[in-house]
Each structure stands twice: as structure tokens, then as C-alpha cells.
Amino acid sequence: MGQKINPIGLRLGINRTWDSRWFAGKGDYAKLLHEDVRIREVLMKELKQAAVARIVIERPHKKCRVSVYSARPGVVIGKKGADIDKLKKKVAEITESDVVINIVEIRKPELDATLVAESIAQQLERRVAFRRAMKRAVQSAMRLGAQGIRINCSGRLGGAEIARMEWYREGRVPLHTLRADVDYGVATAFTTFGTCGVKVWLFKGEILEHDPMAQDKRLNEGGGDSRPRRDAA
């Protein structure tokens, strides 16, 4: 089943944790869940150019804390923090509570599966040859320390009449090993011939301790792929 299931979902509670971290009673759960969906939709729409990999939402008492993981934090913050203030107002309208937005910089976007997938999708939309885009992403990831990477592209590749799937892999990507730190990302390229799907599996090594927060700690300690950039109260 490791070949079929989402690698992140398979490892939740082992070495990965949820992107929405809060508890609610029966009466509030659906409302808060819809709020999370709307928050992510608004932020992803506003931050198209910011290379956002993930959005983590936490809800301490009567507050909403949103952490935006971005490869371009300057685009999120804006001039003198103007853009981040606008985002806070929009999120506050949805949640009707105090909002705190943290920006976390991704220092190595080549080692983030979501950003790699989006980069390839953007290249396909610009009519870059799909094999060249895939090989370039594989080489960049391996050069920066990935232990393995696999990329799948499917659809009318190169404008072909018949849709097909092509993939590249380098190194090892152990999908059945639960202690393996396997990142997974998907993206869709909207080309003139139709849509093309891009999937990326990226193996960064093994996490030996049983800690769902292990990956987040590695990211925030500065030795990983990202570091905290700003806390906008």
C-alpha cells in the first residue's frame, strides 16, 4: 500500500504531524474545518507568486495562528509589512478572532516536493520540454542533499495525441519505510493541450526518533530546509 497511499498521510503521528492543529466540540468542528479551507484558499490565491509550500493553522484559546512556509518571504511580507497586514485582515474576517501570521522561509526550495512539483508545472505551461524540466529538478535535488527523488508527469506530454505517463527516479525512495522522511507534492499544469499532472516524491533521510513533530523541528532549527522569518503579532 505504500506505493498507492499519500506518503504524508501514511506517516501522520509517526514522523509527520497535521497541518491543522486544534480541537473542537461537535458543534464547532464543521465550522472550524470550513474556516481552515477558506483560509487556505484565500492565502494561496493572494500568494501565487510567493512559492508557498504549506500553510499550518493552529488555534490556541480565542486566537488563530497561521504559519506560512514560503520560499519568497519578502513577497508575503511586502513593503514595511503592508501585505501581511492585509492578509491578517482577510483571515480575521473569516475567523472572527485575533490572528497571528508567522512567515517561515524555505531556504532550499529544491528540497520541498510541493515547490518542485509547482516549478515543473510552471515550466510545462511555458512549453519547456517535460524531460528537460524533470531532469533539471532531479539533478538540483540530488545536488543539494536529497537521498532520492521520483517525479511522475502524466497527460498529453509534448502535445501528443494520446495521453501517457513518464517518470524519472534517482537514488532511493523507500515508500514502505515509516521512519523515512518522504515528502510528497502534486501540481497541475494547465497547457493549451489540456491539463498535465505532476507528482513528486522526495526522500531526505530517516527520522529515527518516534516524534510527529520531528520534521517541523528539523525545519525550524536552521539546519534543515527552512527557518522562522517573522512573527507578525
Swiss-Prot record:
NCBIfam families assigned to the protein according to its UniProt record, in alphabetical order: rpsC_bact
SUPFAM superfamilies: Prokaryotic type KH domain (KH-domain type II), Ribosomal protein S3 C-terminal domain
InterPro entries linked to this entry: KH_dom, KH_dom-like_a/b, KH_dom_type_2, KH_sf_prok-type, Ribosomal_S3_C_sf, Ribosomal_uS3_bac-typ, Ribosomal_uS3_C, Ribosomal_uS3_CS
Region (Disordered): 214-233
GO molecular function, one term: rRNA binding
Complex formation: Part of the 30S ribosomal subunit. Forms a tight complex with proteins S10 and S14.
Gene this protein is translated from: rpsC
Listed name of the protein: Small ribosomal subunit protein uS3
Function: Binds the lower part of the 30S subunit head. Binds mRNA in the 70S ribosome, positioning it for translation.
